[in-house]
Amino acid sequence: MTWGRKATGVLGIDRAIAFTVLGRCWAAFSLPVTLFCVVHFLSVKEQDFYFTFDSLLALQVFFDLGIAFVVLQFASHERAHLEWTADGRLTGDPRHKARLASLLASANRAYSWSATLLFFCVLPAGFFFFRSCEEAAQPAAWRWAWASAVLVTALNLRLSPLLAFIEGCGRVADIARLRLFQQFLGALLSWVTFAWGGRLFAAPALNLGFLIVAALWLWFSKRRFLRDVLAARDNAVRIRWRQEVWPLQWRITVSWLSGFFIFRLVNPVLMKYQPTGTASRMGMTTKIIDAMSTVCASWMGTKAAPFGALIARRQFAELDRVFFRTLKQSYAVLLLGCAAFVAILAGLIHLHHPFSSRLLGLLPTCLLLGNALMGILVNAEAVYLRSHKQEPFMWLSVVSAFLTGTIAYVAGRYLGPTGVALGYFLLSLFFGVGAYTYVFRKKRRAWHAAA
């Protein structure tokens, strides 16, 4: 066995994780290039707009309503009773295939409405907010860029249930490979837009790359599969959305809506109340930390569908074995990433490199990294429990959202980024890890004992 194979075995890198990590590594490579373009091609005020675009586009969670995640979980439980054929179809118990067809049709209808509502609600909301931050002498070039960003985001939202459904049906590696190509084309389109003087249009260009890749892949690679599933619809055998899906979905919805206040509120507050450039420094620093966290979350994220299948088969010992092994592997990678980031930032500050002034200082950065380390544990526990088609973290998410939103507003308005970072760290340390882990251990014992 070669050294490379030993390393991938120790780190638990299967095909799905490999594609996912490649995509995240490409994102990690492309992120510095994108940040360089942001600094080089945009004014300081435009940088605030650029990063706040991203925060406001996260309002899509109010229209996604967690349906894609629920679709993935329910698809994985039904697919556990079916098998893939050589020509890319699902075969087996007709009842479970009919339930899959019902799930897909319902998700399609829901997202047609959600994408439309997103466009017509988020577009004017952004206009209202950015006009309040617009300087009198500043050109309004951001308006068309914002409209384009909202349109592309809405179209991506429309396709998201199809991708979640396919992933839930066991094609985790295929979706991971798709994400890799999306990251690649999105970054290239963004850079070209910067280079050609597109300025803020680079923001929608990134998501346009995602849209093009997903639309082409679905049309040329998965069209027949989706049609075959829909052809199995049987009104006598269908998923009863209100009785089966809704009890999980509304809890996921509340948790995901809470996520906006947990992760996205701070940049608009900093842009509104702090000096020009503060929001962009927070945005750049959190972009880097989020990229590292997302790489490490790949280990656990690719296990959502397999976890659902193991639970459907009542293979709880194997479920726990894979979960705890995967958690250790993802933590090891994140610790290495955090150490590397701190070392690089300290070096930039020591050398008085101009780029260091575009990032937060060492203290707030280390606090945000500590928060990310605690967040990876909470994320893993959430993946595990939600794979049971349950959402026990809903009320914790609501409390976290209230406390985080309060910190973001008060500290963001009066104390700046260091106050925000300290508040986030203390909240995760004294509330997040303890409360979420308590619920995780309690529910894990109860659910498996009942089975």
Language-model features, listed with the residues they occupy:
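Hydrophobic alpha-helical transmembrane segments
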Residues: R143-S148, A176-R227, L403, P417-R441
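Membrane-interface junctions at transmembrane-helix termini in multi-pass inner-membrane proteins
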Residues: T153-R179, F201, C366, G370-S397
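Helix-loop junctions and terminal segments of transmembrane helices
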Residues: L65-D93, I289, S293-R314, S387
